[in-house]
Amino acid sequence: MSMQTAPIKKITLSHLQAKKNQEKIIAITAYDALFAQIFDPLVDVILVGDSLNMSFFNQNDTLSASVKMMLYHTKAVCAGAKTPFIITDMPFGSYKDEKTALKNAIRVYKETQASAIKLEGGKEKAKLVKTLTDEGVIVVGHIGLMPQFVRLDGGYKIKGKNEEQQKKLLEDALSLEEAGVGLLVLEGITTPIAQTITQKIKIPTIGIGSGKDCDGQILVWSDMLGFFDSFKPKFVREYLKGKELIQNAIQQYADDVKKGNFPNELESYH
């Protein structure tokens, strides 16, 4: 009689770390219960990203996202997705010092069912990471192209193109690992250094625009499902023409209403 493994009820950090060098981690963003529920059986990780400020609220960058906003959307995602490991982005300004970071991270844990918080920054954030992990908070790191630094950097610029940047990225990764981050997001860095970092550190890397050698991949759902046609980053693969499909459906609905074809007898009460 063959032994069957029981299905995982909730993916934990241990499950994800066990995938290192074994099986790719599948991650996606979500901002509400509806899409979180759709994604639930298909992904390992859901990130409630501050990217919602751009894709959900149509802002130019992520910087005006607030803790209140992130808590609201994290609650919604947790209501829809029961199995994936759920990560909440700490928005700009919410971890400017240890006291502020602890206060906001503890709020995330107390007010939502999030599995972890994510913050941007390299070795300069190592002390903060240790403080948070010492309090029982799972921290996900994020290095490379960091959207919260877009104004300082003068735009969305790929990192790791020269030796100095590559050295810094590796130092950042090693420092964050030592400080206790459970996972590390690599965004917008060149493939060779992403591969090196993935090989050098023991925790899983999740890439976005950082080549295929990372331990996992993440995309913003509205990018990969074709909801934005004004701009598409090079690293995005579009798996659906979502905007077009929905507009076609709404057009059919509008046509039916105008022609008196909706509602029909079967869709009416008597």
Curated annotation (Swiss-Prot):
Primary location recorded for the protein, binned into one broad class: cytoplasm
Gene Ontology MF terms: 3-methyl-2-oxobutanoate hydroxymethyltransferase activity; magnesium ion binding
GO cellular component: cytoplasm
Active site: 187 (proton acceptor)
CDD domains membership: KPHMT-like (cd06557)
Alphabetic keyword roster: Cytoplasm, Magnesium, Metal-binding, Pantothenate biosynthesis, Transferase
Catalytic EC class: transferase
Annotated binding of Mg(2+), by residue: 50, 89, 120
Pathways involved: Cofactor biosynthesis; (R)-pantothenate biosynthesis; (R)-pantoate from 3-methyl-2-oxobutanoate: step 1/2
GO terms of biological process kind: pantothenate biosynthetic process
Highest taxon of the lineage: Bacteria
Any matching Pfam family: Pantoate_transf
Cofactor: record remark: Binds 1 Mg(2+) ion per subunit.
InterPro entries, per the entry: Pantoate_hydroxy_MeTrfase, Pyrv/PenolPyrv_kinase-like_dom, Pyrv_kinase-like_dom_sf
EC number: 2.1.2.11
Named cofactor requirement(s): Mg(2+)
Transmembrane portions of the chain: none
Catalysed reaction, written as an equation: 3-methyl-2-oxobutanoate + (6R)-5,10-methylene-5,6,7,8-tetrahydrofolate + H2O = 2-dehydropantoate + (6S)-5,6,7,8-tetrahydrofolate
Gene3D superfamilies to which the protein is assigned, alphabetical: Phosphoenolpyruvate-binding domains
Chain sites annotated for binding 3-methyl-2-oxobutanoate: 50-51, 89, 118
UniProt cross-references to HAMAP family, sorted A to Z: PanB
PANTHER family: 3-METHYL-2-OXOBUTANOATE HYDROXYMETHYLTRANSFERASE (PTHR20881:SF0)
UniProt subunit comment: Homodecamer; pentamer of dimers.
Protein purpose: Catalyzes the reversible reaction in which hydroxymethyl group from 5,10-methylenetetrahydrofolate is transferred onto alpha-ketoisovalerate to form ketopantoate.
Family: Belongs to the PanB family.
Name by which UniProt lists this protein: 3-methyl-2-oxobutanoate hydroxymethyltransferase
